[in-house]
Amino acid sequence: MNSVADTAIFFGKFLYYFLESLVFKVIPKRKKDVSGEIVLITGAGSGLGRLLAIHFASHGATLVLWDINQEGNMETCRLVKQKGDVKVFAYKCDCSSRIEVYRVADQVKEEVGDVTILINNAGVVTGKSFLNTPDHLVEKSFLVNAISHFWTCKAFLPAMVKANHGHLVCISSIAGLVGINGLSDYSSSKFAAFGFAESLFLELTMIMKTKVKSTIVCPYFIKTGMFEGCTTKYPLLLPLLEQEYVAQKIFNAILEEQVYLIIPKFAYVALFLKQIISPKMMIALGEYLGVDTCMTSFTGRVKAEELQMETKRKEQ
């Protein structure tokens, strides 16, 4: 009897949520108010992190900016302040260091308050084939792109759970859903970030903390210094995404409390095809679009800190 009741309840919920999703396809969700929210953005010193900071500043949020690049972070701080009377706090933080994340997190709690929207955006790209990637760069990719999410969530999630109010945002990648040639360390670290964020979303649902929202973002390559030189065979068919376009999409997804955001929508087709066609057909599609060779001309953004690290290692 219980199985019959459970089945009836399941189909009832399934039908309700299906109809609800159809309604929201036609009628946009009501966007939440983020004024007064304390928003922490990692990797805020440039690119997507900077643009997201500007969006939140325009809507009255208090900004907490983290980046290892202090100069870039202060420039973001300056741009944010141009939006008017905005509370903004900038901190230098190496997100690959658990000790430093916890230390700076304690400083934020003391000086600003409990973070209510956490955006794990910091990321690094090596852009080398697996056999040509030094061990320390593999570790760096995982520490920044995935493991740092564990430390930031450990630091700020307890207060959200206690208040049953908050929002976790994971900036993963389309490379966190589909493996890409030349991005073995980056892709696997983004798979890890996606898996962690999705598991955490389910954990929060199971403990009935439904007011702590999750948004998991998987964009195609963005036109930033991080993917400098990256291109496909037919840029008009599969172009790199503009930063402002992606930032606006992410900001809207947060305001609408959307759980999954994959950009562009063409990527949904690729994910569907991955499930139904043979690996050889997927490889043929990648060759046609030039995705398999997109990293061949990659140059990337080489930071001073990375150059210094490389020099020190060679001297040892």
From Swiss-Prot:
E.C. code: 1.1.1.-
Gene3D superfamilies membership: NAD(P)-binding Rossmann-like Domain
Keyword Transmembrane found: no
Residues annotated as catalytic: Y186
Residues binding NAD(+), per UniProt: 40-64
Family the entry assigns: Belongs to the short-chain dehydrogenases/reductases (SDR) family.
Name this protein carries in UniProt: Short-chain dehydrogenase/reductase family 16C member 6
Organism: Mus musculus
Gene symbol of the encoding locus: Sdr16c6
